[in-house]
From Swiss-Prot:
UniProt function note: Electron carrier protein. The oxidized form of the cytochrome c heme group can accept an electron from the heme group of the cytochrome c1 subunit of cytochrome reductase. Cytochrome c then transfers this electron to the cytochrome oxidase complex, the final protein carrier in the mitochondrial electron-transport chain. Plays a role in apoptosis. Suppression of the anti-apoptotic members or activation of the pro-apoptotic members of the Bcl-2 family leads to altered mitochondrial membrane permeability resulting in release of cytochrome c into the cytosol. Binding of cytochrome c to Apaf-1 triggers the activation of caspase-9, which then accelerates apoptosis by activating other caspases.
GO biological process: apoptotic process; mitochondrial electron transport, cytochrome c to oxygen; mitochondrial electron transport, ubiquinol to cytochrome c
Gene Ontology, cellular component aspect: mitochondrial intermembrane space
The keyword Phosphoprotein is annotated on this UniProt entry: yes
Superkingdom classification of source: Eukaryota
GO MF annotations in UniProt: electron transfer activity; heme binding; metal ion binding
Residues annotated for heme c binding in this entry: C15, C18, H19, M81
The protein, known as: Cytochrome c
N6-succinyllysine: residues bearing it: K56, K73
Modified residues (Phosphotyrosine): Y49, Y98
Organism: Bos taurus
Family, per entry: Belongs to the cytochrome c family.
Major subcellular location class: mitochondrion
Positions carrying N6-acetyllysine: K73, K100
Length: 105
């Protein structure tokens, strides 16, 4: 899988403006991502999701995140995440490696 340190840099550049990862972290424009792996879409307590996110019904894991992060609006039409996606597979792998570690600490 990807490189955790490279993934952290990608998170800081592309995700941290809207998301936190630490346990008990606050929601920003996007939800706190702690405990993301193994959780269904639209389930972070206290965050106001669109129906599209709540109704997608998939469980977040490496494969689902690879697809989602490539093109969020294609994967979940109606999501309010304003992010074009990460086209480079290696960058997505690095980000997912970081998320897997950081959202589980």
């Amino acid at each position: 899988m990807g490189d955790v340190e490279k993934g952290k840099k990608i998170f800081v550049q592309k995700c941290a403006q809207c998301h936190t990862v630490e346990k008990g972290g606050k929601h920003k424009t996007g939800p706190n991502l702690h405990g993301l792996f193994g959780r269904k879409t639209g389930q972070a307590p206290g965050f106001s999701y669109t129906d599209a996110n709540k109704n997608k019904g998939i469980t977040w894991g490496e494969e689902t995140l690879m697809e989602y992060l490539e093109n969020p609006k294609k994967y979940i039409p109606g999501t309010k995440m304003i992010f074009a996606g990460i086209k480079k597979k290696g960058e997505r792998e690095d980000l997912i490696a970081y998320l897997k570690k950081a959202t589980n600490e």
